[in-house]
Amino acid sequence: MDIAIQHPWFKRALGPFYPSRLFDQFFGEGLFEYDLLPFLSSTISPYYRQSLFRTVLDSGISEVRSDRDKFVIFLDVKHFSPEDLTVKVQEDFVEIHGKHNERQDDHGYISREFHRRYRLPSNVDQSALSCSLSADGMLTFSGPKVPSGVDAGHSERAIPVSREEKPSSAPSS
């Protein structure tokens, strides 16, 4: 069963009336004033209009691409190291978990944790799945698709996260 994948900017169809940033994946990054009071910017200056697309695309929201021959997940995990990340496949799902213990930053102590779960298409070759973390903190999980009728090999296993030294060239669509 394939699931339709929606691009993140569709979620902002209602513009400033839709406070979705509060629920997006922002690991330790503060909220802006317009996140709590979306009407404030339009009341101060009726000509001011904040960029809807830039904030959503740069926000750390995951992106899933599924084309004819490949399935790819991009996830911004810039606050986590490969040791903090666990990626495993269970049946038709990939689970990505990140957690780092409490550590000191500029404002005190902080700990972060997230858990994402994605359904894999039925024709993804699970024996050839790979996962890498770029230098700029972009996690890329990918797997080739097999022709229909060929066994894709479903089993439970952990996928190691490899470290890349170059920045990601991923989701800037």
UniProtKB/Swiss-Prot annotation:
GO terms for biological process: lens development in camera-type eye; negative regulation of apoptotic process; protein refolding; response to heat. Zn(2+) 1 binds at H100, E102. It holds the Pfam family HSP20. Zn(2+) 2 binds at H107. Glycans are attached at S162. Contributes to the transparency and refractive index of the lens. Acts as a chaperone, preventing aggregation of various proteins under a wide range of stress conditions. Required for the correct formation of lens intermediate filaments as part of a complex composed of BFSP1, BFSP2 and CRYAA. This is Alpha-crystallin A chain. The gene is CRYAA.
